[in-house]
């Protein structure tokens, strides 16, 4: 994966609120993450939200954050998304973007 000069690797946790379970949200999130070349994970929570972690170049992570806030899967209805624990990382902790059961 080639990175633009100065495109720092970052890690950020996310949680998406709204109608995001039972609408293939995790599958679409995984596909979008892979398309952008990001790594991390996504899972459903007992509270009816979807949460996970994104890692990759800052510009790609920003694109994915916007996607999580505004797009999601076709049948989802996103109320809001929260992002926490953003930090610069020296290397990726994952080799893939996974759906966690």
From Swiss-Prot:
It comes from the Eukaryota. The active site is at 26, 44. Residues 11-101 form the Acylphosphatase-like domain. Its EC number is 3.6.1.7. This is Acylphosphatase-1. GO terms for molecular function: acylphosphatase activity. The modification N-acetylserine is found at residue 2. It catalyses: an acyl phosphate + H2O = a carboxylate + phosphate + H(+). Belongs to the acylphosphatase family. Organ-common type isozyme is found in many different tissues. Keywords: Acetylation, Hydrolase. The gene is ACYP1. The keyword Endoplasmic reticulum does not apply. InterPro entries: Acylphosphatase (IPR020456), Acylphosphatase-like_dom (IPR001792), Acylphosphatase-like_dom_sf (IPR036046), Acylphosphatase_CS (IPR017968). It comes from Sus scrofa (Pig).
């Amino acid at each position: 994966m080639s990175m633009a000069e100065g495109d720092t690797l970052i890690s950020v946790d996310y949680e998406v609120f709204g109608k995001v379970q039972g609408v293939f949200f995790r599958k679409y999130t995984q596909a979008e993450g892979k398309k952008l070349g990001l790594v991390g994970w996504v899972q459903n929570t007992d509270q009816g939200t979807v949460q996970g972690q994104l890692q990759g170049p800052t510009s790609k992570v920003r694109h994915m954050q916007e996607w999580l806030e505004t797009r999601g899967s076709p049948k989802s209805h996103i109320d809001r998304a929260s992002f926490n624990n953003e930090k610069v990382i020296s290397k990726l902790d994952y080799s893939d973007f996974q759906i966690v059961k």
